[in-house]
Amino acid sequence: APPGNFATIDGAITHAQQSGFAIVNLFTAYTPLSRFRDAVGAEIIYLVLSHIAELDKFASTTVSGAATDTDCTLAIRVISTEADTLAQRPMGEIRALAESQGGTMDTNAQAGTWTLSVHLPLGESPPA
């Protein structure tokens, strides 16, 4: 069963670990995230993991970043022979989610490593 905190960044990572992903959690919430922002972060993690699972479920994955008073950054770094394949995917659903929250998404690939970074400003309320 999924953890009770399934819709949080930490819960998403815990669930992935329990599901067999080789994932390390280096995310730090210096400021507690609102339930809505935490759920958005969790959704981004689940979306990225769905891409990873299709290609290389055993890829070494690290989630880092932080939540502060003003923003939340998430960086999901994957070391895999499939890094170039990940880099060719537009990740449009993740970009759309980030941009719908006033944020941005970038990806970077080099030498067997692929990184997706999301920056979300804090303080906005969830859409009605």
Segments the model singles out, each with a brief description of its role:
Residues A1-A22, I45:
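Short beta-to-alpha transition helix within the HATPase_c
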Residues F21-L49, A53:
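Conserved short strand/loop->alpha-helix "switch" segment adjacent to the catalytic nucleotide/phosphoryl-transfer site
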